[in-house]
Amino acid sequence: MDFLKIQTNPLPFFLAESLNPDSMNRIAAFFAHGKRRFSSVKVDNGTLENYHSFNPLVRGTIQQLDSIAPRFALKKGDIEILNHPVTFYETLKEKILKAEKRIFLSSLYIGKHEDELVKVLDDALVKNPNIKLDILVDALRSTREAPHSDSTASLIAPLVEKHGKHRVNIRLYHTPHLHGWRESITPKRLNEIYGLQHMKIYGVDDEVILSGANLSRDYFTNRQDRYYLFKSKDLSNYYHGIQTAVSSLSYQLITSSRGFFLDWPTDNNASEPHLNVERFLSDSTRVLVPVLRTKKVETTTTNEDPDTLVYPVSSFAPLFKDDKSTELPCVLRMLSLLDHKGAKLTMTAGYFNIHPKIKERILRGQACSEIITASPEANSFYLSKGISGLLPDAYVYSCEKFMNEANSSAVKVLEWQNGVVNTPNGWSYHAKGLWVTPPG
């Protein structure tokens, strides 16, 4: 029994019978960095009929994960792995144009010149008047250039203008931890350190693509990421619920004669964050915890035993008064398998910056570990202007420190490179993930 872990923040945790290890560099997970408190969110997943067919170590993992996150049972054919950014983009457009009832997209931002994608969304809305479009992006990133230049917000505002906010619901999440004088003096390229909307959820009807890719040109052409297409109504509903919950804690884009403005709807589930941060965090905790706990099953069960269990786990640290995020407990539980001799770990990260608890599990474990990271020439910040240009070397330094601490032939680090980023035929690397194989 192999273990596969990917994240779109929120992310699913897979337990799968068999998956091809050659696809590891397509797998991804985002790790929350820094020290913080967390508490598990317990759920009732019911009995798994083929529980005893799993590896004994896997059974122990299933029991613990069942106390953290809802479990979704999938069978062969319910998951399609997309390997190339062009395939991801073409698949997304194809799904959108065939939509029958809903399109829901969560991303950090949409590239400000992605006119083709906006036209595809518009065509789908024109073609089928029953479709509802929901978009969730980060407010700071999506209005960075406004009002003096084009931005994500100005790009997608015409969809609201044409189809109305009852059909096109565009939400912009604003971190509760940056407002007032602090926001006015913080450079726009640095304000992300206070928090942002980083989910990448691309759902159409009863299918959902989970990825680490934003909706912009490099992610559609020459930035290697990971893309998982889930053909599951229940899982799609779950992620639609996640997006809906965060949207209810976000601003709504409203069009005006001057372009657009951000409004806080009266039916939102919290007051504006800058008015009372503590109250906002209490409200957002009340809204999000049930979403993490709840699983609504609508699909008809079959006699076929599932070969893959999916546990969606999430990081909502900035929105919890007492952090109830589920991703770190899940990752650490999986990494406890490294204590068994004969276990294997493959990990990949575009940016080498390992959480201290994860690093501790790797260094003290008995497993053979292989880590794939971006070479400096595959780092999107390579030769960029300003302080960000120092980041590739900083990640190399972090990697060297890690290797000095490891001091073991059981830990191997590989650098991914395909040409030189920002030059002809050069790619960047953005995949992040974990794959643990238990012994036996």
Which residues does each predicted region cover?
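Active-site cores of enzymes that catalyze phosphoryl transfer or operate on phosphate-rich substrates
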Residues: 41-86, 252, 264-330
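Extended catalytic-interface subdomain
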Residues: 184-191, 204, 210-211, 240-290
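Short hydrophobic/charged patches on amphipathic alpha-helices used for structural packing
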Residues: 93, 332-335
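A general structural motif
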Residues: 319-331, 351-354, 425-428
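PLD/PLD-like phosphodiesterase catalytic module centered on the HKD motif
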Residues: 2-93, 97, 115-209, 213, ...
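A short acidic, Gly/Pro-enriched loop at the edge of an enzyme's catalytic core
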Residues: 100
